[in-house]
């Protein structure tokens, strides 16, 4: 049976190795350490493992290896740049183990320039997915238009933004709007 110091040492090594490879949240690191302990430290007492995991997580937070707020901020910026809607960004944060309240608080803080951010995300999305003015058909029939609207709605964009984005006539106009929003948006 491994002693407490050895348990903590192995968990610390695993945490540092994992954090050296991936940006992580506290919740995700906790999952990784529990999974590791279940596989590699099966003879240890569950209470010792739990205490060691909490100590390792506290050490990682103290030294700045994991910082949930920094993780959230970087994911919000990356999501905006990638053309994700606020709903998609929220879902990604929840999947990463961030609690809903913390995610909403951070999104509210980043909401300055929100309309422009959603517009920019929608413009990037239609460019990447070849929808609207970037699509094959410049004036799609009503059925194709409905399909494009559905794709944007599934991506988490609101109906008002969808209609305005799909009403853009030319690629040049879309690119000009994207450039304007990029320069005016606080990321």
Can you describe what each PLM-predicted range is?
Residues 1-187:
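An alpha-helical, amphipathic repeat domain used for nucleic-acid recognition
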């Amino acid at each position: 049976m491994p002693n407490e110091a050895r348990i903590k040492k192995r968990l610390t090594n695993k945490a540092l190795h994992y954090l050296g490879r991936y940006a992580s949240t506290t919740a995700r690191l906790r999952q990784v350490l529990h999974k590791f302990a279940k596989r590699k430290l099966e003879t240890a007492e569950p209470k010792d493992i739990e205490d060691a995991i909490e100590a390792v997580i506290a050490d990682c937070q103290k030294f700045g290896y994991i910082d949930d707020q920094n993780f959230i901020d970087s994911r919000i910026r990356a999501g905006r740049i990638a053309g994700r809607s606020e709903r998609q960004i929220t879902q990604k944060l929840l999947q990463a183990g961030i609690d809903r309240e913390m995610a909403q608080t951070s999104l509210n803080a980043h909401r300055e320039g929100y309309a422009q951010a959603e517009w920019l995300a929608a413009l990037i999305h239609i460019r990447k997915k070849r929808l609207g003015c970037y699509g094959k058909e410049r004036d799609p029939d009503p059925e194709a238009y409905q399909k494009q609207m559905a794709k944007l709605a599934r991506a988490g964009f609101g109906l008002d933004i969808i209609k305005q984005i799909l009403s853009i006539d030319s690629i040049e106009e879309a690119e000009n709007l994207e450039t304007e929003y990029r320069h005016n948006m606080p990321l």
